[in-house]
Regions:
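Short hydrophobic alpha-helices and adjacent helix-cap/hinge residues
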Residues: 1-302
Length: 302
């Protein structure tokens, strides 16, 4: 029996999760708790889970996971789930955000599957398509995962020879969709070569606003997550397929519930292969066609 605490209902991640158990003939009873993008609902969901405890809790995303399990060095048994195994998905930087314990340590009841390709590989993916010296990033300054991602990119820029042009939203209150287009225009004015969409729930919700502003300013968008290319208009991405992330998480659940392995002994992992996606309609719109060499291994979406 598994309780699933989700950010925006079921996604392809959960389809992959379910498929893994179906294909391996493992019966599972899933109870869905949908926060509908509202983290304030999590405490009530935790109360419900405690009233009828499942065998395991599945959490989706950094915000929900952090609320459910706390940070590794600041767990509050009154607020966080400590007595049930928890497997998380779609946490982009579990170590940076304190959800995963530092190298050499583990958490007694928590493990998970992360989905972001190494940043250097992402930059190489952009440069395989076109030259890039200035990376434009519009992000929600109120999301820990976005802030840590921009900090890591800035540091990497010093090593790999590019400048991060950051446009934080929400520095003086909640971010607004109306702030996105002016931020993109400002990045274009500063000479950004491409827009970067990292793991950011706010930008994910308004991805079309961002890419439309990009088109208006002659800027393509690169995405580190699948949704923005497959269901949006980002021109390219180096991504984990959501369905495969779900299967990876399911394999960890199987280790815990069927094989009796402690979550502490199951490493937090990412997929070992990523997909290079190109959205051709966006390339056409911007007249930025992919080099032929990319077509040998990229998945081209019309």
């Amino acid at each position: 029996k598994i309780a699933m605490v989700l950010w925006r209902g079921e996604t392809n991640v959960e389809q992959g999760f379910r498929a893994y158990f179906d294909e391996n003939s493992i019966p599972v009873d899933l109870t869905i708790y949908d926060t509908a993008r509202d983290l304030s609902r999590v405490p009530a969901i935790i109360d419900q889970i405690r009233k009828d405890p499942p065998d395991l809790v599945y959490t989706w995303g950094t915000g929900i996971t952090s609320s459910v399990v706390g940070k590794y060095d600041a767990v509050d048994p009154a607020q966080n789930i400590t007595d049930l195994p928890v497997v998380y998905v779609m946490v982009s930087s579990p170590w940076k955000t304190g959800i995963a314990a530092p190298a050499g340590q583990s958490r007694p009841n928590v493990t998970g599957a992360t989905h972001i390709a190494p940043l250097a590989a992402q930059i190489n993916a952009i440069r395989a398509y076109r030259p890039m010296d200035k990376l434009g990033v519009v992000y929600n300054s109120r999301e820990d995962n976005s802030v840590s991602n921009v900090a890591d990119l800035t540091e990497l820029g010093r090593e790999m020879g590019f400048e991060v042009l950051a446009a934080p939203l929400g520095t003086d209150g909640e971010p607004s969709q109306d702030d996105i287009a002016p931020a993109v225009a400002e990045l274009a004015r500063k000479g950004a070569d491409i827009l970067y969409i990292g793991p950011d729930n706010f930008i994910g919700n308004y991805r079309d606003t961002l890419t439309d502003a990009g088109f208006a300013n002659g800027l393509a968008a690169f995405s580190a997550t699948e949704l923005e290319v497959r269901d949006g208009h980002a021109m390219l991405g180096l991504v984990s397929r959501y369905e495969l992330v779900g299967r990876l998480a399911a394999s960890k659940v199987e280790q815990i519930l069927i094989d009796g392995i402690s979550p502490a002994d199951i490493p937090v992992e990412t997929l070992d292969r990523f997909s290079y996606l190109i959205r051709l309609s966006s390339a056409r719109k911007l007249k930025l066609y992919p080099p032929l060499s990319l077509l040998d291994y990229a998945e081209v979406i019309e």
